[in-house]
């Protein structure tokens, strides 16, 4: 049987970034929080799924809160203190994620809604009949 060779994977170096941007992508099914440096390089990210929620529980505000908390802790390990928050999407976890970032100890200096709005683009999905 072939032996497994352990490759020395390079350890991710800690970037020391004081100021960053928190991108909150909130859909009807999930919330993804990505924290980047001002140049756009990802420092930390988390989603409702990576925090441990499955199925319809991912779309709850509490799941968004936990995802934002997890991403904020990882970003603060890199020395981050202040963030600008860009929110995209119509989901339930928008406000909860912003509050969680503040509660985790990050100072929120700006909140901006960057939800893309079509100028009569694609046809929307048909209405649900339950």
From Swiss-Prot:
Alphabetized Gene3D superfamilies for the sequence: Ribosomal protein S11 (3.30.420.80)
Gene Ontology MF terms in the entry: rRNA binding; structural constituent of ribosome
SUPFAM superfamilies the record matches: Translational machinery components
Superkingdom, taxonomy of origin: Bacteria
InterPro entries recorded: Ribosomal_uS11, Ribosomal_uS11_bac-type, Ribosomal_uS11_CS, Ribosomal_uS11_sf
A single BP term in Gene Ontology: translation
Annotated keywords: Ribonucleoprotein, Ribosomal protein, RNA-binding, rRNA-binding
Keyword Ribonucleoprotein in record: yes
GO cellular component: ribonucleoprotein complex; ribosome
Signal peptide: none
PROSITE patterns in the record: RIBOSOMAL_S11
Subunit structure: Part of the 30S ribosomal subunit. Interacts with proteins S7 and S18. Binds to IF-3.
UniProt similarity note: Belongs to the universal ribosomal protein uS11 family.
PANTHER family noted in UniProt: 40S RIBOSOMAL PROTEIN S14/30S RIBOSOMAL PROTEIN S11 (PTHR11759)
Function text: Located on the platform of the 30S subunit, it bridges several disparate RNA helices of the 16S rRNA. Forms part of the Shine-Dalgarno cleft in the 70S ribosome.
Name recorded for this polypeptide: Small ribosomal subunit protein uS11
Source species: Caldanaerobacter subterraneus subsp. tengcongensis (strain DSM 15242 / JCM 11007 / NBRC 100824 / MB4) (Thermoanaerobacter tengcongensis)
Source species taxonomy: Bacteria, Bacillati, Bacillota, Clostridia, Thermoanaerobacterales
Gene name per UniProt: rpsK
